[in-house]
């Protein structure tokens, strides 16, 4: 036990060893919050206050969840694979896989990532003869997701004008389309989980009794629905627990709330204090990441915000290098200065991959990239295409999804004529009309079309049926390999000018499946870690949930370019912040929005 608590500072120790009560831990940047969360879980288990299956730990990235599991495994002699540790989306996916019937879903329901959701909405609007120039699909997607994140279904949405009335109607059509095809988007994972718990009291009581301690990381980034889901499980959300409710241990920092544009509600932290009648608010203020000059500047800036819960970061690391300010004549002058400074640092022995150039908007990167390219400085832009977002990978995954669920129209539409099979736009439109009239999936409607289109479509349907039969007894990596060959994807990319890279990515998908089976195949836990659909359904869920969180590196030391949002939680030896001027950073919209300038300060 002494080893477990060794080297914690006094506030960290107080947080880790709190009695079983609700608590809010205000954790400043670099204050060791991950260590506190993980050690809290280990301490609760090692002192016998709760078993591993009585813990629900929520993170905001899969990377953070895996890090927590890894640290716990090193602290305690337990198998952490079966524990409920993950993101909101990952945990709700696991819950719905276990209770798909009660949730009104097929056993092998598929998850739409953001790109798939947008494609599904485009297809919907096209079927409804909606002008997508006048009504952009991306705006409708934002409208739908924003309502779901508030817990609002189409039937409950307020149509206060004709324009909104149309969007509400399309929202309802989208809900029906997803239900018919057996697919859910990210927001639906959480909303459907919440609704099921709310209406099924015995099931809610089961999970309330099971999870005695709920621990949440990055609480300041929760949206309204996520907070409602947590309250429900903790016994404060409309379904009273049969016994005592769970203890909610929330770790967050109101000064780091920078995702209002994604629906994050900074007010959730104040609501938590009021609704859970918190007696325990502990502040972690000692910073282990930065020097004093940086912290003094950050404290001075953030104290201008009103309504803060209050912290003042400090460090024992000394003052460090002073913050330098350079006033440029133009963006070109600024970029040239930054790149020349990088060159000087590299010549002095500083590694390029420990240098980051941050900007408020992606558009600012162009001039920086030009200067870096001109002076032959290797760089990497964070936010480029990620592995699971790459065209060839998404095509292969679409074939996998069709094998798992032939009613997945989004997957069908993606690959029915890829590689090219002579199925043109008119044939697809005729198929969509036939499916609409028959109220069936595109796959089931394909056989009803006659003529050349029908023959081509019939061959495609036969290919999918053959693949379903051929792969039934194969291991997951073998399934993917068979699909890549039989679908024609490998042959197609052999003739592509970027073919070698794309084929290597397809081979990497096979490797990813092998690694997934190795990591997850033994995750028996409490019996519900692997969904009823087996390894294929689990891997498809993994691909959607993980989509791009781990960007593939090129093995070359490079300067890192990214937005300030993308930089959250990362550390570099040298950081340049470009475009610190009115209209860029702070952003021009900051003065138009309530509390906009305060969010810009938090972002800085």
Task: Describe each PLM feature range.
Residues 4-8, 13-27, 53, 103-110, ...:
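Inter-lobe coupling/hinge region of RecA-like P-loop helicase motors
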Residues 4-7, 33, 37, 43, ...:
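Conserved RecA-like helicase ATPase core segment
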Residues 6-17, 21-26, 36-37, 49, ...:
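Conserved helicase NTPase motor core
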Residues 21, 50-54, 79-82, 120, ...:
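Short glycine-/polar-rich loops that comprise or flank the Walker A/P-loop
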Residues 50-62, 83, 217, 251, ...:
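Conserved RecA-like ASCE P-loop NTPase motor core of nucleic-acid helicases/translocases
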Residues 53-143, 154-159, 169, 326, ...:
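Conserved P-loop NTPase-based nucleic-acid remodeling module centered on helicase motor cores
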Residues 85-87, 188, 192-193, 557-564:
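Conserved two-lobed SF2 helicase motor
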Residues 157-160, 351, 365-377, 390-392, ...:
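Conserved helicase C-terminal RecA-like lobe
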């Amino acid at each position: 036990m002494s080893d477990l608590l060794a080297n914690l500072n006094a506030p960290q120790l107080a947080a880790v060893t709190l009695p079983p009560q609700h608590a809010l831990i205000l954790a400043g940047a670099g204050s060791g919050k991950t260590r506190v969360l993980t050690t809290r879980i280990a301490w609760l288990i090692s002192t016998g206050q709760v078993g591993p299956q009585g813990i629900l730990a929520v993170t905001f990235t899969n990377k953070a969840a895996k890090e927590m599991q890894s640290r716990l495994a090193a602290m305690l002699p337990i198998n952490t694979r079966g524990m409920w540790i993950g993101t909101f989306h990952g945990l709700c996916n696991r819950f719905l896989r276990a209770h798909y019937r009660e949730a009104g879903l097929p056993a092998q329901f598929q998850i739409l990532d953001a790109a798939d959701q947008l494609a599904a909405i485009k297809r919907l609007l096209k079927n409804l003869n909606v002008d997508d120039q006048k009504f952009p699909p991306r705006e409708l997607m934002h409208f739908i997701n924003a309502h779901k994140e508030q817990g609002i279904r189409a039937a409950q949405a307020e149509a206060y004008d004709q324009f909104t009335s149309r969007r509400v109607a399309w929202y309802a059509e989208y809900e029906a389309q997803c239900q018919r095809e057996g697919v859910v988007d990210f927001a639906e994972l959480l909303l459907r989980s919440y609704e099921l718990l709310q209406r099924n009291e015995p099931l809610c009581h089961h999970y309330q009794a099971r999870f005695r301690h709920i621990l949440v990381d990055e609480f300041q980034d929760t949206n309204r629905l996520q907070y409602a889901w947590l309250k429900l499980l903790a016994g404060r959300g409309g379904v009273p627990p049969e016994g005592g409710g769970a203890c909610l241990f929330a770790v967050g920092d109101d000064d780091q709330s920078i995702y209002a544009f994604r629906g994050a509600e900074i007010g959730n932290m104040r609501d938590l204090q009021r609704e859970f009648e918190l007696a325990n608010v502990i502040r972690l203020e000692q910073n282990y990441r930065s020097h004093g000059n940086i912290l003094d500047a950050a404290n001075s800036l953030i104290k201008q915000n009103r309504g803060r819960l209050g912290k003042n970061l400090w460090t024992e690391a000394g003052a460090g290098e002073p913050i330098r300010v350079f006033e440029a004549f133009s963006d070109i002058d600024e970029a040239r200065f930054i790149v020349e400074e990088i060159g000087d640092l590299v010549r002095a022995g500083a590694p390029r991959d420990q240098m980051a150039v941050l900007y408020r908007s992606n558009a600012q990167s162009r001039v920086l990239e030009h200067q870096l390219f001109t002076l032959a400085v290797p760089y990497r832009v964070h936010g480029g295409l990620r592995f699971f977002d790459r065209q060839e990978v998404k095509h292969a995954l679409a074939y996998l999804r069709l094998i798992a669920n032939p009613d997945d129209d989004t997957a069908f539409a993606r690959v029915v004529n890829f590689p090219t099979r002579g199925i043109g736009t008119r044939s697809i439109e005729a198929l969509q009309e036939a499916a609409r009239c028959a109220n069936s999936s595109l796959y089931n409607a394909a056989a009803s079309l006659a003529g050349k289109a029908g023959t081509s479509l019939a061959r495609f349907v036969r290919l999918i049926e053959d693949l379903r039969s051929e792969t039934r007894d194969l291991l997951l990596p073998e399934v993917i390999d068979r699909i890549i060959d039989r679908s024609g994807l490998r042959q197609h990319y052999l003739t592509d000018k970027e073919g070698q890279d794309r084929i290597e990515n397809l081979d990497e998908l096979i490797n990813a499946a092998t690694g997934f089976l190795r990591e997850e195949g033994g995750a028996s836990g409490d019996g519900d870690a692997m969904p009823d659909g087996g390894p294929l359904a689990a891997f498809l869920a993994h691909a959607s949930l993980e989509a791009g969180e781990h960007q593939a590196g090129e093995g070359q030391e490079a300067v890192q370019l990214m937005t300030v949002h993308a930089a959250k939680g990362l550390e570099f030896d040298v950081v340049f912040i470009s475009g610190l001027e009115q209209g860029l950073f702070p952003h021009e919209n900051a003065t138009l929005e309530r509390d906009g300038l305060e969010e810009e300060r938090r972002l800085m």
